[in-house]
Amino acid sequence: MLQLKDKQVLVLGLGDTGLSALRWLARQGARLSVADSRALPPGLDAVRQEFPGMAIHLGPFTAAAFKEAELIVASPGVPVAEPQVQAAIERGVPVVGDVELFAQARSAHAKVIAITGANGKSTVTTLVGEICKAAGFKTVVAGNIGLPVLDVINDAVDVYVLELSSFQLETTYSLAADAATVLNISADHMDRYADMQAYANAKARIFTRAGLQVLNADDAWSRGMAAEGVAQLTFGLDAPRSAQDFGLLHDAGEAWLARGQRKLMPVADLNITGLHNAANALAALALCTVLDIDEVVALQALRDFKGLPHRVQWVADIDGVSFYDDSKGTNVGATVAALHGLNRKLVLIAGGDGKGQDFAALRAPVAKHARAVVLIGRDAGVIADALQESGVLLEYGDTLEEAVVKAFNLADRGDAVLLSPACASLDMFRNYVHRAEVFVKAVTDLQKKEVSA
């Protein structure tokens, strides 16, 4: 357990996580300083107001900022590989994140369910939270979704449901979740990790001292994380592997969520579209087994869940063409899941900041499902190179608004237009939510134009 009173703590990175950590550390009696590589980081005014006199180091990290630190608390956006961080580690200075501080401070009676993965983690985290709330548990959903973890520590909480990114897990050592999952691994953040193995290793840290591992039977990376001597359950889109595992069973042409050979509910009863969401529902059920929740209550919570914004979310129908917003699809794996999940002919809008990904995995699903692809953003050309042999028409849009009009004109009646960029948004937009807002407005404007035509 870290002793924080009177300890000199350097917080790296402002923004929501950094500000949350500063406030929490101040309450523990730590002596504080902060460093951020940006000249004007978000939260700077609030920090200056709340912590007058505290040393604030802005711009490229220097040895002087790190010199007196006895503990470093790194925000997720700061890589552990940063040279000054590495130099501090070599001097024996511990480097942790806010999730590690949470792990050491949380009440022992509260359960922790932890979720990570390249795709689906926000949906599964929210589903688990909804199931726990429906079962009457005082539940907090936090981490990479919602509030920072240090803002929600409360002795009255029964269950913490945490969405955790690979960045957060890099500096987490003792979470000891009651149940944890790595939903899947696909190329993402390759601008931060040396290779897929390094990315997977960061994700696998979620299983450190976990009570139950929930593994994706359909994902070789997740499956390969099974640890000896730890309880495991699997989920997947094939029949369950054992009487305790989760999967799909088929009866008279209808797919059912199942545990072992027991049919639980028809997939068609879910309000969230696509087989990837059936997998998400199965993962949520598997994670909740550590809480001994009444199955009827859990299944009703699944039925009631309407989905999250910007995850293959229906926007409008215009002249027989359905528009879907999957702006949260910021990597190749998410877009592949969306294409298979909608499982209909469509025009795909993709592109943005590719984060060093290999887009080759898009080729086969695009060839199967797409009538055309309209590419936008900085890495449009990189994606075009990867899709050249798909046999699908490739077009370009200088703006997202232009791409929406082009996609509509390329679509046939009965098709969909899917915004699923497979890329980050910051080359053209403030964030993925802003990208979604621009898309929805472009669709709405198109709808008005078609109605008045």
Swiss-Prot record:
Cell wall formation. Catalyzes the addition of glutamate to the nucleotide precursor UDP-N-acetylmuramoyl-L-alanine (UMA). GO terms for biological process: cell division; cell wall organization; peptidoglycan biosynthetic process; regulation of cell shape. GO terms for cellular component: cytoplasm. ATP binds at residues 117-123. GO terms for molecular function: ATP binding; UDP-N-acetylmuramoylalanine-D-glutamate ligase activity. Signal peptide: none annotated. It comes from the Bacteria. Belongs to the MurCDEF family. Its EC number is 6.3.2.9. Pathway: Cell wall biogenesis; peptidoglycan biosynthesis. Keywords: ATP-binding, Cell cycle, Cell division, Cell shape, Cell wall biogenesis/degradation, Cytoplasm, Ligase, Nucleotide-binding, Peptidoglycan synthesis. Its main location: cytoplasm. It catalyses: UDP-N-acetyl-alpha-D-muramoyl-L-alanine + D-glutamate + ATP = UDP-N-acetyl-alpha-D-muramoyl-L-alanyl-D-glutamate + ADP + phosphate + H(+). Pfam families: Mur_ligase_C, Mur_ligase_M, MurD-like_N. InterPro entries: Mur-like_cat_sf (IPR036565), Mur_ligase_C (IPR004101), Mur_ligase_C_dom_sf (IPR036615), Mur_ligase_cen (IPR013221), MurD (IPR005762). This is UDP-N-acetylmuramoylalanine--D-glutamate ligase. It is an enzyme of class 6 (ligase). It is found in: Cytoplasm. The gene is murD.
